[in-house]
Structure formats: structure tokens, C-alpha cells
Amino acid sequence: HERSSAASDVYKRQGNEIFIIYSNDPRKVNYKQFGIKKATLIDNTGAWTDEEGLNQHIKNPSVERAILTAPAKGKIKNIVYGINDERLKGDEKIVGAASCTTNAITPPLKLIDEAFKIQSGHIETIHAYTNDQNLVDNYHKSDRRGRGAALNLVITDTGAAKAVSDVIPELKGKLTANAIRVPIPNVSLAIMNLNLKKSVGVEELNDLFKQAAFHSNLRTIIDYSNSIDGVSSDFYSNEFACVYDAQATISNFNCVTIYVWYDNEYGYSRQVV
């Protein structure tokens, strides 16, 4: 997240040249002229989410594999780094990296489920608006997203609950999810209301996440915040998949509510890489 300028179709960053290539057909892009071969291509267009569409990249002789930055459909594996990447055998041509929200909520859900067993739950994401929404009221196939994104709180759906169950099969059918798009450009918040098998206190939950953030194999994925005045802008450019907000945790016997922040751009990009 920083300003840059590009006078041509080459963007220079930290001594590297990044070429800006224009094409309407991924099969016909001439990557060879840029010295690109056996490439891993990251598709974040959102144009294709299934094997048929994404195979267009693979048919290009310079592309060896493709990673989708959205929940993949069909038989494509959805992978959240640090959670289920052991499923990768190394011979996959196409892999789905799920979504920014799925990458943010899956690590905390796995952590809590392993410790206390999740019986059911609902996840509400307070999500920065995206380029899928209209800036002024206009037609959109998803009606509410057609309303002005910079002026409204917009209730919309999210596939995060289903995507979580793809990554953690034990949670299949136990979670629901929804989203509220809000008029900020970046950093989102997931609120998880969970019913557990046993009663758990706030201190016990905070200890669980503190240990995970500092002393477990999730320490590069889950961050821990104990700030009493933390707000969304504090987590701009945070490199973790999610940041557990210890001050916001609520417990009512076996019903708990946890809050996790996430930079839905930079934090997710780190997960993809």
C-alpha cells in the first residue's frame, strides 16, 4: 500500500520489472516475449471460478499452474495456507486460495473447534466495499449491491460459510454467514457468534489465541491485539490473515463472540503468495 508512478507499461518495484500486459484471451498472451516460462499465474479477475474457465490459462504454453483468488467450484481444491495446505500433492494445475474472508475466519474457527468443539454459529463480516459494487445507484444483478457503495451500509451474501466447510469438513452444516459492505476502502471485521460444546470464559479464549499467535504454527497467520482503542485503520497493511481483538471478546457460558480484523487486500495477498 503505497503510491507509485508508471510512465509506460513497465512497473518497477524494488529492482524488479513488472510488465503490464493487455489481452482479452488468456490463451493468446505472448508471455515468452517477456522471458516468462513455466509460470504460476494468479487469477484475480473473478471472471472464472471453475476448471473449464481457468484451464484457459493452462492452455497457454508459458503457464504451468494457476491460483484462483476466490472460492473455487467443482473439483478444484480450496486451500487456506497454514490450515489445509497439506492436501496439496504438488501436481495440481489449478488451486483455489478461497477468499479474504475465508482466510481470515478459518484459522480462528479451526483453533476454537479443536479446543472446545463448535456446535453451531453465525459469522457476520463488516466488509470494506469492493469493485463489485456500484458507486452510485444503478443496476446490479445482486440488487442491494447496485446501491451507492460509498453512501450506504449494504447487506449482502457471502460464500464464506460454505468455503470454511470445504477447508474444515468437521464444520459442514454448522455455520451460517452474511456480510455488510461498509463505506471504507480497506480493512474488514469478522464477528463470530459461536455455540460451543462447553462453557468457556473470556480469559480462556484470550489465552488460547495468545498462545496461537506467539507460540504455535499459526503465529504467522493469526495476530493478537490487546489494544483498548483499536479501530480499523490501525490494521491497514497488517500482514496476517487475521487479528484477534482480545478486548472485544464476549462469553456467556457456552455462547461466545469473537472479533477478528483483517486487511482484506494485503493480508490476503500474503496468504496467496
Residues covered by each model-derived region:
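Rossmann-fold dehydrogenase core element
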Residues: Y81-C100, K117-E124
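Active-site-lining helix/loop region of Rossmann-like oxidoreductase modules
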Residues: G90, P107-H215, R219-T220
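Short alpha-helices
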Residues: V95-L109, D113
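Single conserved hydrophobic/aromatic residue that forms the stacking wall/gate
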Residues: H1-A7, Y11
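Rossmann-fold NAD(P)-binding glycine/threonine-rich loop
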Residues: A47-E92
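Short glycine-/small-residue-rich Rossmann-like dinucleotide-binding loops
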Residues: N24-D25, T45-G46, P71, S99
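Hydrophobic alpha-helical hairpins/lids featuring a short glycine-rich hinge
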Residues: V29-I58
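C-terminal active-site/capping subdomain that shapes the small-molecule cofactor and substrate pocket
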Residues: A177, L189-V273
